[in-house]
Amino acid sequence: MMPTGNFDLNEVKRRMQGAVQSLKHELGGLRTGRASASMLDPVQVEAYGSHMPLNQLATVSVPEPRLISVQVWDKSMVKAVEKAIVDSNLGLSPATEGQVLRLRIPELNEERRKELVKVAHKYAEAAKVAARHVRRDGLDVLKKLEKNHEMSEDDQKRHADEVQKVTDGTIAEIDQLLAAKEKEILTV
């Protein structure tokens, strides 16, 4: 959380950039057309009593342009990995052979493109919500500082305006990332 003794706008900026970086990572997983090991980066597997990234349970490789191979290290985790991939909303159906899952990357039809755009919108909305939470936290710190007479009302309003400008810039960056990804998905 933010320091309560004084206000740090850089902390607000850093946390908002965290939301943007998270969105970039999630959108990066929405690949179009070609297979990529990073497509599976967002996949979380329920394993050993917690959620773990797929790459901590298996080796992911791309032997062909439209095929992803997932070599699960622990035989007892194959079903959990398979379920996580199916539940990930990436539109991939694993074909399991022992401890190896093969994922054919389907040609993107119009329906799948629209589904991917919806998923991208969902990710972008989550990033906007995260940015708004950071804004709220920052404004709460400012209100406390003013209430405790550690900051003047004028300074509080000035800092609140700065927080709003950072928020507006972050939301605009999120919208820009979403528009670029949407264009990439819909380009046939």
UniProtKB/Swiss-Prot annotation:
Its main location: cytoplasm. Keywords: Cytoplasm, Protein biosynthesis. Signal peptide: none annotated. GO terms for molecular function: ribosomal large subunit binding. InterPro entries: Ribosome_recyc_fac (IPR002661), Ribosome_recyc_fac_dom (IPR023584), RRF_sf (IPR036191). One of its GO terms (biological process) is cytoplasmic translational termination. GO terms for cellular component: cytoplasm; cytosol. It is found in: Cytoplasm. It holds the Pfam family RRF. It comes from the Bacteria. Belongs to the RRF family. NCBIfam families: frr. Responsible for the release of ribosomes from messenger RNA at the termination of protein biosynthesis. May increase the efficiency of translation by recycling ribosomes from one round of translation to another. This is Ribosome-recycling factor. The gene is frr.
